[in-house]
Amino acid sequence: MRLFAAATVALVLLLGQAAGEELAEERAGQAQGDAESTESSETTTDQAVSEPPITLVHVLNPGEREYLSPNLIGVQNIAMTFLPLSMNFVNIIDAFREITAGVRYEILLNALDTKAIQPAEADIVCRLVILEKPWLRTQWGDKHRELVTSNCTDPAVNSVAGDPAEKARLLNEKYVHRSRRSANDILGRHKPYDEEAAKAQLQKSLDKLTAGEGPHYKIVKVYSASRQVDSGILTRIDADLIDGSEEQHRCIVDIWTKVWVRKDEHEITFKCRNQPVVQARHTRSVEWAEKKTHKKHSHRFDKVDHLFYKFQVRFGRRYVSTAERQMRLRIFRQNLKTIEELNANEMGSAKYGITEFADMTSSEYKERTGLWQRDEAKATGGSAAVVPAYHGELPKEFDWRQKDAVTQVKNQGSCGSCWAFSVTGNIEGLYAVKTGELKEFSEQELLDCDTTDSACNGGLMDNAYKAIKDIGGLEYEAEYPYKAKKNQCHFNRTLSHVQVAGFVDLPKGNETAMQEWLLANGPISIGINANAMQFYRGGVSHPWKALCSKKNLDHGVLVVGYGVSDYPNFHKTLPYWIVKNSWGPRWGEQGYYRVYRGDNTCGVSEMATSAVLA
């Protein structure tokens, strides 16, 4: 009896080792193939080649379960051997093996039933339980394997579907003379797909996205559809869709289906004409989403949700949790009301809409500006500007950009350093007018070396002029690049290319004096109320004074020119200032802001200053 027990244990260990060696050989073969493909692309050398490492084979103990990679060809071959002929193999979902009275494989796979009456019923999940007896061989010399149970449907065994054992016996008899099928016979190209079935599948996916947090679309018309079976099911649909903005687009929709245990996962890509590509994913049922949102059987086509999703895609917003996303969505909704109010009360031609600041609170947005308030009780430290009188009529328009006196639009990032960009822009313009050379000077030097201002926590142009004078000048941007945070000052006086003797204050509230100074000297540093700039998209901005008070200056910018927009059909003329901002070229009009000229809109002439070069 002891001898029999010992023999049984030895047999079980032998089975585990044999199975482990088989899969180890396959994995090693794959690794060797990868290595050979890599070596083929490299130049050979005369160096000695080291011996390949010894592969350690894991021996399974009785009852121990080992999960197998779905990508192993051997596992796929086993599954395809016992899959009914009426079904096309798609991919392995899950697989494991264990030592029992042999090697027991349990494989969960995704397949297509080619005999399904309704296309929507073609996608199925099969679970196969297969017993391998390696001490037995088939007539072709392969290891003997037999099907234990299967929940796959097949017309030949439907009559015994309720009896798993009988069903397995019939399937074994059916496949006893069947050789392994090639994956090339199964995986095909795009084939035409029933349009009604495609429309139903698309509608189901859209319902899930609407119920969750995805984009929102409505189907208008389906033109054509196709399917491709690979390691999953790719359904491609050509259709007209209406998005959350109530705009109709011709779109190609790709639905990539992966079937998993107890839930399915779909990756959906919307490629609409003249629109950015939108990608989404859903992994839960409509019923689950309905319970979550408490909107059972009443999915609301929410325009705001759709706009918020497009905002996330365009500006790359990623939120750390669902709670944060919901908070940002609430802020976004409130900001849409502000945008609506700005558009309704706009007296110029400006359009306000969704910008990168659309999910920020007012306080968060203010952190992206950074201008301190002047203490009106104290002297600024600057001299009163002597504005040269312009002889003759002032030009209708003027732009220092056309005179090569304005550098490219810069981006201060998530740092309240507008004051530094306003000052360097002013000095860059003055230097270009004086020397004929347009150079970029360093804002980072001011963040690091100006001890009066507070780097990313804000500052004042008045202080920056004084700091440059005391420090000894400015280095070039390339020599002292911008980091959007305060670091240790490492100013190199030998690399100072421009020096400042002081600064001047232009007459407060006098926009004609600003024009004359601009024409004679160069761009002007100003402070402005940035309320209307948060959602500015273009046009001449002329908001109500109640929405943009001249007293609340919070942003430092640069006036580089002026002009006039004429609207003869409406008998309307809009004079404006051309303002260079520091939020990058994607904001506003390629980084610029046109604000109404003539009534001190948003305090444009309240804090106008300019450096005096040494």
Curated annotation (Swiss-Prot):
- To which species is this protein native? Drosophila melanogaster
Signal peptide (from-to): 1-20
**Family named by the database record:** Belongs to the peptidase C1 family.
Question: A GO BP term, please?
Answer: proteolysis involved in protein catabolic process
Q: What is this protein called?
A: Cathepsin F
Function comment: May have a role in autophagic cell death.
Gene encoding the protein: CtsF
Q: Which residues are glycosylated?
A: N151, N492, N510
Any idea which residues are catalytic in this one?
Answer: C418, H555, N581
Task: List keywords of the entry alphabetically.
Answer: Disulfide bond, Glycoprotein, Hydrolase, Protease, Signal, Thiol protease, Zymogen
Ligase among keywords: no
EC number from the UniProt entry: 3.4.22.41
A GO CC annotation recorded here is: perivitelline space
Residues forming coiled coils: none
